[in-house]
């Protein structure tokens, strides 16, 4: 008796793409963090863009604009919390991604590693300028 996921025409496509993926056996859950970084970055950009549509940076009205976002904008509270927690999740994924590279010895690929370190410094500088200084 054969498995339906290997014989059904539609399930066969899904099976070959997701279940029986032609990937090495050493591929572990540590390799997800690069794609999670992309997802977190996309969420940060989108939520930041939508929050910036309603935010005013004037010192007299900044707090009122945040309360306006949370109370009057549809799902504004969700956008604000996604943006705040997405930044933390981004850095958790970033540090785990670097940790995976250290664990598996990716620092031996010096050109790729140096580009990654430059990107890490750029991300940290951007976070400092955008979140710590204001």
Curated annotation (Swiss-Prot):
It is a multi-pass membrane protein. One of its GO terms (molecular function) is metal ion binding. Keywords: Electron transport, Heme, Iron, Membrane, Metal-binding, Mitochondrion, Mitochondrion inner membrane, Respiratory chain, Transmembrane, Transmembrane helix, Transport, Ubiquinone. Heme b b566 binds at residue 97. The chain crosses the membrane at residues 33-53, 77-98, 113-133. Its main location: mitochondrion. Disulfide bonds: none annotated. InterPro entries: Cyt_b/b6_N, Cytb/b6-like_sf, Cytochrome_b_N_euk/bac, Di-haem_cyt_TM. Its cofactor is heme b. Pfam families: Cytochrome_B. Binds 2 heme b groups non-covalently. Gene3D superfamilies: Cytochrome Bc1 Complex, Chain C (1.20.810.10). It is found in: Mitochondrion inner membrane. Heme b b562 binds at residue 83. One of its GO terms (cellular component) is mitochondrial inner membrane. Heme 1 (or BL or b562) is low-potential and absorbs at about 562 nm, and heme 2 (or BH or b566) is high-potential and absorbs at about 566 nm. Belongs to the cytochrome b family. Component of the ubiquinol-cytochrome c reductase complex (complex III or cytochrome b-c1 complex) that is part of the mitochondrial respiratory chain. The b-c1 complex mediates electron transfer from ubiquinol to cytochrome c. Contributes to the generation of a proton gradient across the mitochondrial membrane that is then used for ATP synthesis. This is Cytochrome b. It comes from Chiroderma trinitatum (Little big-eyed bat). The gene is MT-CYB.
